[in-house]
Amino acid sequence: MPIRILPSDLSSQISAGEIIERPASVVKEIIENSIDAGSKNINIIVENSGFQSIILKDDGCGIDKKDLLLAVCHHATSKINSLSDLDKLTTFGFRGEALASIRAVSRLTLISCTRFNDVAAKIYLEGFCSKNIILQPIAHPEGTTIIVDNLFYNIPVRLKFLKNKKLEFSKICEVVKKIALSHFYINFSLKHNNKLITQYNSINNRKNKINRLKDIFDTLDTSEFLEIKEKKYRMVLFGWISHPYNFKKIKNIQYCYVNNRYLYNNIFVNAVRAAYSKIEQKKNISFVLYLTIESFNIDINIHPTKNEIKFHNPDVVYTFIYEAVFSYLKKIKEKYYFNFSCKKQTQLNKEKEFYFYDSDPTFLTLISSIFFKKKQIFKNIKNKIKHNNFISKSTPLEKYESSIGRLLIIIHKYYGLIYHDNNFLLLSFPVAKGIVRKQKLKNNIQKENIIEYFLSNIKINLTSQEYLILFNKKEILSKFGFHLIFKKKYVILSSIPAFLKKCNFHIIISNFFAFLFLKKQVFISDIVDWFYINVFIELKNWTYIRGIEVLLEIEYYCPLLLINPPSKLLQKININAALCILKI
């Protein structure tokens, strides 16, 4: 058979099949057009699951009567003018294919009016045959009405594969639901066979956005969801995630949006699941998340229906979503277990009987406060309490005494007042935590157990001398988790130690490399000391619970340090001198 160009009506039907798969595809395309037109009210009326007719009415800006015929032609759009505009897209449509594809497989009526038109215009088309075009004036308010009749009337083969009308209508409902979830300021209504199915009222207050979830998911208990909002890496993440310690059975809801466009993306799902796995192993994870990202950092034009998207820096997006979700889950974890401990303590204090060590409120409270910490610390605590088989239930948390002594109070955010053997001591928590982290790093290097954090490759330009210094030190750097790829004139950094990921690692790495360039010879101890001074000592507010946690870590990781503690860690307070002055 010779090669020939297909007739225009046949080629249009074939290309339309990629975009218009079912009635729900029509609903999606025309709603997105209405949103691009700035509509505040969108009403959808469906007959016979969309096979008989689909009607959409909106109050958008409308289509000028001189552009009405052009609007139903292939590749006719007002969204882009040049190839560079694809990097600046803020609209749903841009290819100019939606109405042309719908026209190719249905009997289409398009009525529209702009604020500049005295009268509206109506156009009627059957398939892609230019002979059946009727254009006439008509009365109509500002906005657009689209009537799609007899869908797939000219493609009977397609109708054979779409026999389940209940399924097709459920697909339409799902499309409306997905779009309504990302456009809170628009009123949506859906009617089927003259019966109102859904009505989603507009929400103008950000605090009330969760009410849209209540409207869409009738049985959903929104109190089981946490609102999150994070801004970083020139991206914004907003939405709701299910409570990590929710023990009720809730519907599995997973919706993710990029620039208000719904899509199912593995980066979202994997990042959220990874964050939950650090807190609580849950099979049933629900979330509705909205990512706002600069349009030039994504590629929408990779799928006919635009249901897929490509990120130019997927690793950065994954890291951002993971860190944002994990930070909120971590706060909830700490709050949840602290409340659990307080309730348990109150309940136990009502009783004055004695019991075995494993019901000790000290043990329970400590376990809850350092939940999910190293198993070795748990064993250490348990061994300590095991020496006293019977302990009073009224033993409060503040009576817990470590080898250093009993922590009484936090002073000036960073220091702990400790009582030990009739002496008062002042402990620096930043120094203590730094020493613990330093010892952990030493242990991990000895065991070759450094955890790496993989980056999107970072290119580092170096002088020939700096290049040579790093090349000579690549083996010792690899022990710390720095993976360097040496090219001819530059170096690529692909991983760093995991303990740097929460820091501003770009500045830390720059300073660290500057330190290496000044050293002709460097040892493991030199690098450990550098991290101790520049990374491990953090000035942040300390709580009583975290203070006890650090005391336990010192006991476990640095027991020899307690024999002769450094002056920067622990200072004895001269109470006797003060008593002599105050003596009556």
Curated annotation (Swiss-Prot):
<dbReference type="InterPro" id="IPR038973">
    <property type="entry name" value="MutL/Mlh/Pms-like"/>
</dbReference>
<dbReference type="InterPro" id="IPR036890">
    <property type="entry name" value="HATPase_C_sf"/>
</dbReference>
<dbReference type="InterPro" id="IPR013507">
    <property type="entry name" value="DNA_mismatch_S5_2-like"/>
</dbReference>
<dbReference type="InterPro" id="IPR002099">
    <property type="entry name" value="MutL/Mlh/PMS"/>
</dbReference>
<dbReference type="GO" id="GO:0006298">
    <property type="term" value="P:mismatch repair"/>
</dbReference>
<dbReference type="InterPro" id="IPR020667">
    <property type="entry name" value="DNA_mismatch_repair_MutL"/>
</dbReference>
<dbReference type="Pfam" id="PF01119">
    <property type="entry name" value="DNA_mis_repair"/>
</dbReference>
<dbReference type="InterPro" id="IPR014790">
    <property type="entry name" value="MutL_C"/>
</dbReference>
<dbReference type="InterPro" id="IPR020568">
    <property type="entry name" value="Ribosomal_Su5_D2-typ_SF"/>
</dbReference>
<dbReference type="InterPro" id="IPR042121">
    <property type="entry name" value="MutL_C_regsub"/>
</dbReference>
<dbReference type="Pfam" id="PF08676">
    <property type="entry name" value="MutL_C"/>
</dbReference>
<dbReference type="GO" id="GO:0016887">
    <property type="term" value="F:ATP hydrolysis activity"/>
</dbReference>
<keyword id="KW-0227">DNA damage</keyword>
<comment type="function">
    <text>This protein is involved in the repair of mismatches in DNA. It is required for dam-dependent methyl-directed DNA mismatch repair. May act as a 'molecular matchmaker', a protein that promotes the formation of a stable complex between two or more DNA-binding proteins in an ATP-dependent manner without itself being part of a final effector complex.</text>
</comment>
<keyword id="KW-0234">DNA repair</keyword>
<dbReference type="Pfam" id="PF13589">
    <property type="entry name" value="HATPase_c_3"/>
</dbReference>
<dbReference type="InterPro" id="IPR042120">
    <property type="entry name" value="MutL_C_dimsub"/>
</dbReference>
<dbReference type="GO" id="GO:0140664">
    <property type="term" value="F:ATP-dependent DNA damage sensor activity"/>
</dbReference>
<dbReference type="GO" id="GO:0032300">
    <property type="term" value="C:mismatch repair complex"/>
</dbReference>
<dbReference type="GO" id="GO:0005524">
    <property type="term" value="F:ATP binding"/>
</dbReference>
<comment type="similarity">
    <text>Belongs to the DNA mismatch repair MutL/HexB family.</text>
</comment>
<dbReference type="InterPro" id="IPR014762">
    <property type="entry name" value="DNA_mismatch_repair_CS"/>
</dbReference>
<dbReference type="GO" id="GO:0030983">
    <property type="term" value="F:mismatched DNA binding"/>
</dbReference>
<dbReference type="InterPro" id="IPR037198">
    <property type="entry name" value="MutL_C_sf"/>
</dbReference>
<dbReference type="InterPro" id="IPR014721">
    <property type="entry name" value="Ribsml_uS5_D2-typ_fold_subgr"/>
</dbReference>
<protein>
    <recommendedName>
        <fullName>DNA mismatch repair protein MutL</fullName>
    </recommendedName>
</protein>
